[in-house]
C-alpha cells in the first residue's frame, strides 16, 4: 500500500521547490494547491484513525496560522527528516498566514510522510474556520473559495488520535464519556465535518479540569471537561501512562495536571499576536523521557510589543 504513495524523482523535485517557495513567504498557486491536496489525500486515507507512533519524536500543539512561529519551531526542534514530528491539530484560523501554514504542513507530509503525523483539531472543520479567519484569508489571497474547499476536504482525512509507543495517548482535545476503550476510535468515520456531540466531537473539543472530578459541561459549548479520576480510569483501562493534548492556551506553553498524567502543549507564542504567552514543544526520547523547550515569538516587523497577561477564554 505504501508503494502506491511513493514519490517519483520529478514529484520530489516539485514538492521541494514548493517547500522552498513557502519558506520564502510565497503562497502556492491554485494549481499547486490542487495537486498538493490530491496527493495528501492519497497518503492520509491510508492512515488509520489512531496512528501508532514510535519514539523519538517531537510533539507540538496549536499553530493557528502563525507561520513565522512555525518556521521558528522547526529551527528549534530540527527540520524534517532529521526530526520526527507529531502535531496535535489547529493549524488554521486566528493567525494571518493560515494558508502558508497549512500549505507547508501538507507539503512536508507529502514529502516525508513517515516522519510527520498531522492530527485533526477542532478548527480543521468548515463550520469553525469559515467564521474564525481561514475562509476569509483564502478568499483574500486567491480571489475565490476554491482553495478553501480543497483544503477543507483534506481536513476530513486527518487522523483523530495517536499513541506513542503504546503508552502516551494523543488527541487535540481529550477524552469522552462515550469512550471506554481507545479501540472505539477505530470504528469512527472521520471523513466528515466534526459532529456537534459524541466521541469524534469530544476527542477534538474536551478539556481537563484541574480541581473537580468526573465529567462536566464544557464552557465551549462542545465536548466535556474531565477530572483526574477520569484520567486515572482511562489510562488504567487502556494500559496507558499519559495523555498529551493541545487545544488550550497555557501561558507557559505547557501545563501538567492530574498528577502530571495529562499534559497540555501549546505551540503558538504570543497567541493572536496579543496574549504574550510562551510556546512549547516536547521531545520524547526512546525511553519516553520528555524534554520540553519553550520559545518566544519569531521576530516580526511592525508588530506591537505585548505584555503577558491572563487571556480571555478562546474557542
From Swiss-Prot:
Cofactor (UniProt): Mn(2+)
Annotated cofactor note: Binds 2 manganese ions per subunit.
Active site residues according to the UniProt entry: 123
Residues recorded with modification Leucine methyl ester: 315
Protein name: Serine/threonine-protein phosphatase PP2A catalytic subunit 2
Keywords from the named record: Hydrolase, Manganese, Metal-binding, Methylation, Protein phosphatase
Enzyme type, top EC level: hydrolase
GO cellular component terms, A-Z: cytosol; nucleus
Binding of Mn(2+) 2, residues: 90, 122, 172, 247
Region annotated Disordered, chain positions: 294-315
A single MF term (Gene Ontology): protein serine/threonine phosphatase activity
PROSITE patterns per UniProt: SER_THR_PHOSPHATASE
Superkingdom of the organism of origin: Eukaryota
Disulfide cysteine pairs (residue numbers): none
EC number: 3.1.3.16
SUPFAM superfamilies reported for this sequence: Metallo-dependent phosphatases
Catalysed conversion reaction: O-phospho-L-seryl-[protein] + H2O = L-seryl-[protein] + phosphate; O-phospho-L-threonyl-[protein] + H2O = L-threonyl-[protein] + phosphate
Membership in a protein family: Belongs to the PPP phosphatase family. PP-2A subfamily.
Species of origin: Paramecium tetraurelia
GO biological process: mitotic cell cycle
Binding positions (Mn(2+) 1): 62, 64, 90
InterPro entries: Calcineurin-like_PHP_ApaH (IPR004843), Metallo-depent_PP-like (IPR029052), PPA2-like (IPR047129), Ser/Thr-sp_prot-phosphatase (IPR006186)
Record PANTHER family: SERINE/THREONINE-PROTEIN PHOSPHATASE PP2A-RELATED (PTHR45619)
Maturation and modification: Reversibly methyl esterified on Leu-315 by leucine carboxyl methyltransferase 1 (PPM1) and protein phosphatase methylesterase 1 (PPE1). Carboxyl methylation influences the affinity of the catalytic subunit for the different regulatory subunits, thereby modulating the PP2A holoenzyme's substrate specificity, enzyme activity and cellular localization.
Start-end of Basic and acidic residues biased regions: 298-315
Amino acid at each position: 500500500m505504501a508503494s502506491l504513495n511513493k514519490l517519483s524523482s520529478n514529484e520530489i523535485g516539485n514538492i521541494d521547490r514548493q517547500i522552498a517557495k513557502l519558506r520564502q513567504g510565497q503562497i502556492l498557486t491554485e494549481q499547486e494547491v490542487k495537486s498538493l491536496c490530491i496527493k495528501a489525500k492519497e497518503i492520509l486515507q491510508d492512515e488509520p484513525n489512531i496512528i501508532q507512533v514510535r519514539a523519538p519524536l517531537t510533539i507540538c500543539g496549536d499553530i493557528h496560522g502563525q507561520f513565522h512561529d512555525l518556521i521558528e519551531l522547526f529551527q528549534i526542534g530540527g527540520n524534517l527528516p532529521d526530526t520526527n514530528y507529531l502535531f496535535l491539530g489547529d493549524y488554521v484560523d486566528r493567525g494571518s498566514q493560515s494558508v502558508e501554514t497549512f500549505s507547508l504542513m501538507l507539503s512536508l507530509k507529502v514529502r516525508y510522510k513517515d516522519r510527520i503525523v498531522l492530527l485533526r483539531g477542532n478548527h480543521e472543520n468548515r463550520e469553525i474556520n469559515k467564521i474564525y479567519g481561514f475562509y476569509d484569508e483564502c478568499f483574500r489571497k486567491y480571489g475565490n473559495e476554491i482553495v478553501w474547499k480543497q483544503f477543507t476536504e483534506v481536513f476530513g482525512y486527518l487522523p483523530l488520535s495517536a499513541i506513542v509507543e503504546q503508552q502516551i495517548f494523543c488527541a487535540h482535545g481529550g477524552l469522552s464519556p462515550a469512550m471506554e476503550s481507545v479501540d472505539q476510535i477505530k470504528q469512527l468515520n472521520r471523513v466528515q465535518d466534526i459532529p456537534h456531540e459524541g466521541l469524534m466531537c469530544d476527542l477534538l473539543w474536551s478539556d481537563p479540569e484541574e480541581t473537580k472530578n468526573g465529567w462536566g459541561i464544557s464552557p465551549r459549548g462542545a465536548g466535556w471537561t474531565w477530572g483526574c479520576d477520569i484520567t486515572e480510569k482511562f489510562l488504567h483501562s487502556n494500559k496507558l501512562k499519559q495523555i498529551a493534548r493541545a487545544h488550550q492556551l497555557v501561558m507557559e506553553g505547557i501545563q501538567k495536571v492530574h498528577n502530571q498524567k495529562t499534559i497540555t502543549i501549546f505551540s503558538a507564542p504570543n497567541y493572536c499576536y496579543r496574549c504574550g504567552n510562551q510556546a512549547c514543544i516536547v521531545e520524547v526520547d526512546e525511553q519516553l523521557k520528555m524534554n520540553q523547550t519553550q520559545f518566544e515569538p519569531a521576530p516580526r516587523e511592525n508588530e506591537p510589543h505585548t505584555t503577558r497577561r491572563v487571556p480571555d477564554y478562546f474557542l
